[in-house]
Amino acid sequence: MVATMEVAPEATSSYGILDAENDGSRLVKAKGMVEKPVAGTAPSNLAVIGRYILTPKVLNNLGKISEGAGGELQLTDAIAKEVEEGRDIYGYRFDGQRYDCGSKAGFLQATVAFALSRADLRDDLSAYLRDIVSAQIAAE
């Protein structure tokens, strides 16, 4: 099982993408997966977002696959091998707020959102953010 969410078609080259029987339901059966497909070649816009429930077989497959995108062993490729071998893999559409902590901006967004959710940090951080945003606007 992999968590997925829809991304813009132009963003598919940044993610592992699920090739699925996409009927719009929250649970979809995978036909395959591809890691960071070249723009315009993705089989869908269902991005794998880094949450997995895996069998030990998938982890064993990591030792049997070739280097993939970026010259690295890709978990996506090991999961795709499961599908190729006839095992069922499902994608579950995530519904909620997600932050891409693989990017600097996403990591900062997650950190700020987390801090603002805490009563012991919210007031001081809110005041600080107001001050620096006001200063930035005034400087423009």
What is the meaning of each model-derived region?
Residues 1-114, 119-140:
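Unchanged
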